[in-house]
Amino acid sequence: MAAKDIRFGEDARTRMVRGVNVLANAVKATLGPKGRNVVLEKSFGAPTITKDGVSVAKEIELADKFENMGAQMVKEVASKTNDNAGDGTTTATVLAQALIREGAKAVAAGMNPMDLKRGIDQAVKAAVVELKNISKPTTDDKAIAQVGTISANSDESIGNIIAEAMKKVGKEGVITVEEGSGLENELDVVEGMQFDRGYLSPYFINNQQSQSADLDDPFILLHDKKISNVRDLLPVLEGVAKAGKPLLIVAEEVEGEALATLVVNTIRGIVKVVAVKAPGFGDRRKAMLEDMAVLTGGTVISEEVGLALEKATIKDLGRAKKVQVSKENTTIIDGAGDSAAIESRVGQIKTQIEDTSSDYDREKLQERVAKLAGGVAVIKVGASTEIEMKEKKARVEDALHATRAAVEEGVVPGGGVALVRALVAVGNLTGANEDQTHGIQIALRAMEAPLREIVANAGEEPSVILNKVKEGTGNYGYNAANGEFGDMVEFGILDPTKVTRSALQNAASIAGLMITTEAMVADAPKKDEPAMPAGGGMGGMGGMDF
């Protein structure tokens, strides 16, 4: 086992705080509408330019191991806030720095670290309650667009495109972000349920222009096994032919004689049929077939529930207004399922989302909710260079997370104002002893830090602006973008409550751990081995003169 280097007390905390300051100073330069860019070196290719706090934090590793520990703990604050709320990483870092710096000073002055921590926790708990009190639910598209705009570093086009996407696919809908091919941002919306399986034979195509098979008001047969014998399909095909409607078959596989017969029937115009493979594999395939059954008001023909394909009738089939099948995708639009049954199914999947511990499973379950509840929107990010594309895509993803958080817990006035209002409301708190009361004061002072940093980045005097904001009430604050005072909500400067709350709670959690740290252990630096002695020179070659 390698030898360890151990630091105690003040020496340990001083080094840790030094690391915190290095990371926080780099991250906080990006805060606010007039925040600066940070350039990150890459091992190959052009450097990355970003205004995203968590991207900056992730790049920082310090040479001194004790300083690096401090930096990594604050990095944890940024990452945790990003995971919880999707944004607010820079705010969380600024809060953590302020709490740690003041807390370390108090410990150095002889105060009890545990009492300081209790005081900080007490103040944060009261501030979170106050944040929830001043929070307002987001009900309209305008508020959603404003939240997205602020999170995307005041880029209105991003805020508007996210609001439009949410309007089209609903609050539960899946919105994905991809790299586009143009210069402008684009929005593609797929309404209804889409899955990534196309037609099994090109002979099913009936729309030559789009090279797709379009079915209007079709019946939908859902089967969880292979179909190779056409006799099994005859009762269903006869019923559909009598009704004069097209048919979509979704099964594990349609092959051989069955597929050939369906193609011949389609070409001759007897019955318009399209066959596709069922999406997914194993249990996920069964679940997705059940989703389709609920959406279309049909039944999955499965031996597990005692239904055989040859016994199936037209009553077991689902319905939809329209189905479009391309080479790679199938889209079911406006299924005829019962809305109460769909809601119940969505609720069931949401329960599974809460219970699962796998990120992959959670993502797949959320996709299923979206397909049942609304649809899927794809935001294609446009930019003129690859560097700009990466930076812009990161901002769009941030803004999307922030708007989801706003829909979840509502919004508070932005620009650091919500924390200032919360600290004024809980300003008369006192602890059980003097040290706890000092801990409360540290937390209250730290809650001013985000506003101070936004103002400093805008080139103004933080204390002057802060006092003026404190004199106001409610949503009154400072718009750093244009230097005006006024109602932050009217200015469109909003923060999701969840983002502000998570930033404060995570910063307090890490600050409490750091203040109460008394020893730090790291690997001792290895001593450099002495270099090999230089080799002797080659002997002269006698008798040769130059």
UniProtKB/Swiss-Prot annotation:
It catalyses: ATP + H2O + a folded polypeptide = ADP + phosphate + an unfolded polypeptide. It comes from Xanthomonas oryzae pv. oryzae (strain KACC10331 / KXO85). It comes from the Bacteria. CDD domains: GroEL (cd03344). It is found in: Cytoplasm. GO terms for biological process: protein refolding. HAMAP family: CH60. Pfam families: Cpn60_TCP1 (PF00118). Its EC number is 5.6.1.7. PANTHER family: 60 KDA HEAT SHOCK PROTEIN, MITOCHONDRIAL. Residues 534-546 have a biased composition (Gly residues). Keywords: ATP-binding, Chaperone, Cytoplasm, Isomerase, Nucleotide-binding. Forms a cylinder of 14 subunits composed of two heptameric rings stacked back-to-back. Interacts with the co-chaperonin GroES. Residues 526-546 are annotated as: Disordered. Together with its co-chaperonin GroES, plays an essential role in assisting protein folding. The GroEL-GroES system forms a nano-cage that allows encapsulation of the non-native substrate proteins and provides a physical environment optimized to promote and accelerate protein folding. GO terms for molecular function: ATP binding; ATP-dependent protein folding chaperone; isomerase activity; unfolded protein binding. GO terms for cellular component: cytoplasm. Belongs to the chaperonin (HSP60) family. ATP binds at residues 30-33, 51, 87-91, 415, 479-481, 495. InterPro entries: Chaperonin_Cpn60_CS (IPR018370), Cpn60/GroEL (IPR001844), Cpn60/GroEL/TCP-1 (IPR002423), GroEL-like_apical_dom_sf (IPR027409), GROEL-like_equatorial_sf (IPR027413), TCP-1-like_intermed_sf (IPR027410). This is Chaperonin GroEL.
